[in-house]
Amino acid sequence: MIKFEKVNYTYQPNSPFASRALFDIDLEVKKGSYTALIGHTGSGKSTLLQHLNGLLQPTEGKVTVGDIVVSSTSKQKEIKPVRKKVGVVFQFPESQLFEETVLKDVAFGPQNFGIPKEKAEKIAAEKLEMVGLADEFWEKSPFELSGGQMRRVAIAGILAMEPEVLVLDEPTAGLDPKARIEMMQLFESIHQSGQTVVLVTHLMDDVADYANYVYLLEKGYIISCGTPSDVFQEVDFLKAHELGVPKATHFADQLQKTGAVTFEKLPITRAELVTLLTSLSVNSGGEN
């Protein structure tokens, strides 16, 4: 689906202001996967994200998206199809809304790619239903809606382009806890429908709950990758790099360090933690 091979990126190359942001990145996003990218500000994850849909081209190495190869010498006309294959929901996407009605805003993208208005509006209606926005809102101005509803409109607008990969850049930033949970459940539902998803986040619990593969970035390098279950076992390594772990993992690790219990493998979700603690309680129940 998407493959990075020895990708390097330098801002303002061949100038006194040259600044290298990515170093020898090897990365793969498989079809149907839910992949997470984690890193602090300055880790390179935003630069990497912009390579996913051809907004940036590698200084060295190559990015393959489907059957399209993007390198330093690729022409814009060769890269343009990548932007239809990979849809990016940037932080605070509601700031990009502009049309006079919700339906028109969502239909704008498909029309921009040459789809007739009637068909574009049919696609828009399908995607608005998918993101859970009732038809009573479709003829309203997007600016009359709540923040969470506006974000759903923006996400529907990306989905209306029918991308093969949906990239989410800190998608719950600024939302209250209830809206945040609902938004993550929406993305899980979209993933379950067969959509390939890439999540850029700093929230480890979301990675544990939803992703099936994760890459950790630091200063432009991938410092760890694997399934969340494997990566989050390295608690001390993550702490040394000032990266957190899921709350359930932190609790279990602290409990284990007291000597009260030994886990064969640290849980990464609340459900896993409850199951393990219940099992321990049952096993020791005869002594109580």
Curated annotation (Swiss-Prot):
Supply the EC number(s).
7.-.-.-
Q: Please give the subunit comment from the record.
A: Forms a stable energy-coupling factor (ECF) transporter complex composed of 2 membrane-embedded substrate-binding proteins (S component), 2 ATP-binding proteins (A component) and 2 transmembrane proteins (T component).
Q: Where does ATP bind?
A: 39-46
- What role does this protein play? ATP-binding (A) component of a common energy-coupling factor (ECF) ABC-transporter complex. Unlike classic ABC transporters this ECF transporter provides the energy necessary to transport a number of different substrates.
One Pfam short name: ABC_tran
Give the gene symbol. Answer: ecfA2
Domain of life where this protein originates: Bacteria
A GO MF term: ATP hydrolysis activity
Species, as recorded: Lactococcus lactis subsp. cremoris (strain SK11)
**Keywords (A to Z) from UniProt:** ATP-binding, Cell membrane, Membrane, Nucleotide-binding, Translocase, Transport
Q: Which PANTHER family match?
A: ENERGY-COUPLING FACTOR TRANSPORTER ATP-BINDING PROTEIN ECFA2, HEAVY METAL TRANSPORTER
Query: What's this protein's family per the entry?
Result: Belongs to the ABC transporter superfamily. Energy-coupling factor EcfA family.
- Under which name does UniProt file this protein? Energy-coupling factor transporter ATP-binding protein EcfA2
